[in-house]
Each structure stands twice: as C-alpha cells, then as structure tokens.
Amino acid sequence: MRGSLALMVPSIAGARMTQNATFESVTTDSRTASAGELFVALRGENFDGHDFLEQVASRGVGAVVVEQLPPGLKLPAIVVPNTLVALGQIANFWRTRFDIPVIGVTGSNGKTTVKEMIASILAAAYGEEGRLATRGNLNNEIGVPLTLMRLTEAHKAAVVELGMNHPGEIGRLTAIAAPAIGLVNNAQREHQEFMHTVEAVAQENGAVIAGLPADGVAVFPADDTYTDLWMGLAQQRGQRKVITFGLTSAANVSCAHRASGAGSELDVTVAGTGKGDGTFTVQLAAFGLHNVRNALAAIACAVAAGVERDAIVRGLESFAPVSGRLQRKQAACGATVIDDTYNANPDSVRAAIDVLAEAAEPRILVLGDMGEVGTQGREFHEEIAAYAASRGITTVLATGELARHMTAAGAQHFEQFDELLAALDAKLGTKSDATVLVKGSRFMKMERVVQHLLGQHNSGKEAH
C-alpha cells in the first residue's frame, strides 16, 4: 500500500493530521519497521506500540498513527481515538480503490482450507501474482487489514479469510474487507465459551452475507440446519444473488464423489447459476467428506467470481492439504500419521475420526483437549470418546484436563506428555502399519506428537 496521510485522513473517524507525508507501505511491527513505512501503534494485552515510537523513528519510518502524540516526536502523524479501528479504516480506504471481486470466507470449520482452495483456483485463473490471498490464518482485526493493504494493480481477484471468537467480529471485518462475494462454509460448535449456541455462531458468520452490497453474491450450504437463516440474511436488502452448495440435488453446486487414490474424485454439477452451469470432474488430493464439501464451497465462490471452468479444475487439482490439517506423513516406524493438529472443536474432531475410520486397522487416535467449550467441556469430550468407539476406533490416547472425561468410553488418559509418548511408542513398536490421527486445540501443541513420531525429537516433555 502506497499513499499519503492527507488522502487517508477523511476516511478515518476522529483523525487529526499533524503534517502530511507519503509512505510506501504500512506496518504494525516495530521490530521490522523500515524507512518509508507508516507505523500504526497498536495496543495489546502484553504490548503497546506507543512504547516503541522512538525506535521506529530511528529506523526511518515516514509517519505514524497514534492515539497520543508524545512530546518531542517530530514524525508526521495521524492522531486517532483508537489505532486498531483506524487500521481497519485505512485498509478499507485502500480496498475500495480496487474494482475486483473480493471473496470473504467465514465458517466454523474449514475456513483456511477453503480459502487455500479458492486461492489455488484464482492462481490458475490469473497467475500467482494476479491474486491476493490471506497468508496462513491471519483472519482477525489485524490480519485482515494487513492482507488488504497488500492489494496492488496487478491483482485481478482476492480471497480474504474472516475469523471470529466473539460476537460482532465478522460484521466489523466485513465492513473493512467489503467483499463482493460472501461465503459461510458452515456453522458448528466452535467458540462455545463465548458464542454459547450454534445458532449464535450461524448468525455471527452470516454477518458476511448481511454486509454484502445489493449486487453481492451470498454463498452458503443448501443442506445445513441454518440454510434458511442465511437465505433470510441474503434477502434482507433486496434479492441478492445466492449460490448454494452441498451434497443434495437442490444445491446450485453439488457432486457425486468416491474415494480415489490420495483423496476423492468429484463429479460436479453446477446448475441455476447462469454462465458457470455444467458438469465436470475433479481429482481432489484431500481426504474426507468435509473436504468434498470444502471443494464445493470453493467451486461455488469461483463460479460467483466468474472464473472459467478449466481454471476451477486446474486450481483444485493442484491444491495440497494445509499444514496441520489432515496431512498424511510417514512415521519413523513406518506408521501413517494423519497430522490434524492445527485446532479442534467437537465437529472437526468427528470429521477427522471419520477419515481415520476409513483406514485399515490398526488405528490409533491421539487427542488433546478441545478448548473454548464453555460449560460443555465434559459433555463434548465424552461425546467424542463415544463417537470414536462407534466408528471402530478402539485405541484412544488422550491428554489434557478435559480429556480425562474420555476414559468412561475406553480411552487411556495421560497426565504427563512424556507418558503419552511412551505409551504410543509401545503400541507402535519399531515397525508398524498403523494409522495414527493426532488432533487437539492449538494450546495443546499436539504437533509435538507428530514431531516425535517423525523422529524430530525436540517435542519437549511437558506436563498438562
């Protein structure tokens, strides 16, 4: 993002400029701030960017955005009531300079995977340099603005992931990103500590639909409990275009599917969308029914953006699973490791267990606590243990405070992480053809189990 303070100030509520200046890009990180950049001094729980203004000045930044102007600071500045809000308004100012399809991706599970599928499709259509995509999962009130500020004249389309864990966040991010296409991938049991009900999650994620312009396109499942809710949001301000997806013939984008090699083969049907209608086949290198649905969501968004069919097929067929999301790896002992350690909630764990259940025996589930479950922690962990047993997963190794509730259904619980690793090693031996699914919420750092199995013995022997 390149610009001047004078051009931006009218777009920032309550802003006051000390003097004009131009800048080449925007940063919020004092450690990497460099000459010619605009530094936005954010405040966080454990830091305050205002404490580093002298440091960024010594690095040669061109200007700063601050809430308080310290005495003696000679840098050009914009003074605002709230720098986090200002960051979003600056990003929206920049975003509105580009008349390109921006796709906003929300949902309880699969956001990052669908975003990467869409990014792969857009790269096939416009080239790697012709599309912008969220890096990793930078999907919050800092990550979304920083993503949008990377827009350039070279970009023909963009896909931006919008995340939340509290009410109101999707609406704010939608206002910043101003998407022309809004996807709700699903509504499931995420962030229940703060959201309390799945309906509240559905309503919150639906804010991306409510925030679309009148000519925007709403994309959501045709076969979800909350389909009618999202349809209602799409029609609140006139008849926005709607493209649905799902495993039902009633969906605009649907498919027949079968297991094939390292993933699934999809016979896709697109109907009732206009220009993108037709049938085609996609070889998807990702396991699980939920990834079939993720692919349908990506196709629906691509159709909404006007992407040609050949680019949709090429993009999806070049997609590779995202790190820590059902990635298949080979353990040192020969076992197959399914690395799904990025995060966990009850519905994503059930989906991962479904993938494990398709593998030949022996099968092992290694699970750490699921977080942000509110008062339902015991219930959710008992449910998952029972579900694993119902799918024929008889070896379940669990760790974490809440995971102790899984023992009633036959799981083994370990207080110490090194005890879990020792038990897993004993079950696998030096040579094994087992399949091991490893999953847990981010704070459990279950990737340490994967590192151990792969022979990367830096996993640490921590207690929980």
Where on the chain are the PLM-derived regions?
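Short amphipathic alpha-helix with an adjacent loop that forms part of the alpha/beta core around
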Residues: 421-431
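Residue-level signal for inorganic ion chemistry
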Residues: 8, 37, 56, 90, ...
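Phosphate-binding loop of NTP-binding sites
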Residues: 87-222, 228-239, 451-464
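Acidic, Mg2+-coordinating active-site environments of NTP-dependent enzymes
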Residues: 67-74, 181-336, 361, 386-389, ...
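N-terminal leader/targeting and accessory segments in enzymes
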Residues: 1-89, 93, 357-360, 386-387, ...
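ATP-dependent carboxylate/acyl-activation modules
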Residues: 105, 323-327, 443, 447-451, ...
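Short beta-strands and strand-loop turn motifs
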Residues: 11, 67, 100-106, 132, ...
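Active-site beta-alpha connecting loops in nucleotide-dependent enzymes
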Residues: 44-47, 322-324, 341-413, 441, ...
